[in-house]
Amino acid sequence: MSRPTTIAVINQKGGVGKTTTVINLAASLSIMGQNNLVIDLDPQGNATTGFGKSNSEEEKNIYNLLIKKIDIRETIQKTEIKNLDLIGSHVNLSGLEVETANDNNRAFVLKEILSAEKNGLLDNYDNLFIDCPPSLSLLTIMALVASDELLVPLQTEFFALEGITQLVKTIDRIKENLNPSLKIRGILLTMFDKRNKLSSQVDKEARNYFKEKVYQTVIQRNVRLSEAPSHGLPCVIYDKNCVGSKSYFKLAEEFMKSGSIESAA
């Protein structure tokens, strides 16, 4: 059995569809038969609540895994979706940077945990998806160090390309100093509005700049994608026939066919 691929879903800017992508891509892949584990590394815990779980769960959370070093099996929760498990966030995660200030090895803690477990329990998974905070914090660095690949959601709005250019520079610094094998799996265009010329312009510019890194699938603006988290369900379960769900099922198919691509300088 091959080891799972660890994929961080990342953008230093908030509101780009990052958590929506984690939830619905992982759910789509699981519905298609793959085994997936979502790790919610964002203190806001939106991926956790998006699966109908609490980000104040006292035992089964990523904070206890990183700080208390408890057995990873004690942190994994089943979701309502077959083949899809979760290590949820916790409100205490926001204080992690202060709590680990004296640990010179703290950037590697998550990598060491996942690397050790990939020889055992985690081998049952095809993918480990990490939902990152929308900032370049210690938690984000931990995710970048622990990951094999990155998936970058890019909203088709003004200033989007400027932000992702800065992110690519950050990725290259991480590659140079902490994780030389890190690769970009793909860039996903989100919040696309075909009625808006700006969306089409950003789409064109992104494909001109990042070439084959950009997925052919685009995620259109869709109210059902926004509604689903309040029901504690991925949209692909909440309303599998809506435009947003169909886009994520299409992305899942493309994701399974695609390989990872070296980061641009």
Residue ranges, per PLM feature:
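P-loop NTP-binding core
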Residues: 1-265
